[in-house]
Structures are given as C-alpha cells and as structure tokens.
C-alpha cells in the first residue's frame, strides 16, 4: 500500500496538536504534503505554491526566505523574530535540502520532539537555555 505519512510524522503531528498553540508558526519546507500543515492545521511560513502560481499570487519571495532560513543560520537569526517563528520542524523534506542548519539548531535551541528523522525545535525565549 501507499503511505503518505510515516509513523514518526504522525507522532510528531500528535505532539504538535497536544503541545503547541493553535496559532503557532512553524518553519518547514514548502512541500504539498507538509506534515505540519496537513495533519495539525498549524501555520507554516510558506506552503506549496502549486496552485498559487495559477492565481497570480506572488509567493516566491516568501518561499525563497523559508528555504534560506532552513539553510543559512545568519538568515535564520536575522528573520526569526520578524517572521514570528515559534518552532522549526525538520523532517524528511527539510533534510533533503543541501546545507540544512540542523547542527546550528541543535546547538542553540531545545529539542521539543524527536522521533526517527523528525525533530522539532522550540524557539520560545523561555525554552532557550
């Protein structure tokens, strides 16, 4: 059979639903089958542009910024607060990016959830040691 979400992704979604605010903002990749957006209804910085293009909506700048924040620690820190980020979700799609900043995030932010290839970092000031 076809599996859209792994067991770890489902566990991460359950954690998000039970432990984050409904209006929490997550930095993730913009894949159309995004775990955070699809399974939890939480907001992400930039979702899939698959349909937006045909409606004339300009999403490319936000899409580029989201990818740069996932791959460049300086860009991440320069935009983290102004974008209003609460969490960073690193899963299979995010790890496929060249240069994803997982080491930087692990060194600077607490891990709120981890299972297999899924890691969620908490960016709240009271969570940061």
Please identify what each model-predicted range represents.
Residues 1-129:
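Extracytoplasmic
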